[in-house]
């Protein structure tokens, strides 16, 4: 099974206070899953760990985890994906950033997993970490 994990999932796996910590950790460390992520996910997790958590070493480890786990499935943002993300964002009234995850998952046949309940999960655009099988 190929799962595209958004930044919320990678961060939840590293944050014991996150409601999805246990489920996200199982997903991130599962060897039965083909992990995928957007290339921008690396920067987002690094930014949160460095700026919000004030932990550059944790940021470095998280960035490497995403890069290692998604080695062959790190989705690069190109013109076609950006165009589709804008179309989805306009239609769903979500950010283009969130829509990029949706567009990549649809295009490449991944199941999108997100901790963003309001904008992605409740709209049926993604599954929460605790609904996916590790």
Predicted regions and their residues:
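Acidic, PIN/NYN-like endoribonuclease modules and their adjacent C-terminal/linker elements
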Residues: 2, 75, 102-134
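Internal, well-ordered alpha-helical scaffold/interface segments
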Residues: 22-25, 43-47
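Short, well-structured N-terminal submotif of metal-dependent ribonuclease cores
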Residues: 1-37, 52-61, 118, 134
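Alpha-helix capping/helix-boundary segments
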Residues: 9, 41, 81, 101, ...
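Active-site-proximal, substrate-binding regions of enzyme catalytic domains
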Residues: 44-71
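Active-site neighborhoods of divalent-metal-dependent phosphate/nucleic-acid chemistry enzymes
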Residues: 72-115
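A cross-family signal for key residues in well-ordered alpha-helices
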Residues: 11, 47, 103-106
């Amino acid at each position: 099974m190929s799962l595209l994990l958004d930044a919320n999932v990678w961060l939840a796996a590293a944050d014991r206070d996150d409601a999805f910590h246990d489920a996200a950790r199982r997903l991130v460390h599962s060897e039965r899953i083909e992990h995928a992520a957007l290339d921008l996910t690396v920067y987002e997790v690094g930014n949160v760990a460095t700026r919000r958590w004030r932990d550059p070493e944790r940021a470095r480890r998280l960035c490497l985890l995403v890069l290692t786990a998604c080695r062959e499935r790190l989705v690069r943002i190109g013109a076609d994906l950006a165009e589709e993300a804008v179309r989805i964002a306009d239609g769903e009234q979500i950010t283009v950033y969130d829509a990029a995850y949706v567009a990549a998952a649809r295009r490449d046949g991944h199941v999108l997993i997100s901790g963003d309940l309001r904008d992605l999960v409740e709209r049926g655009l993604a599954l929460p970490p605790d609904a996916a099988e590790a």
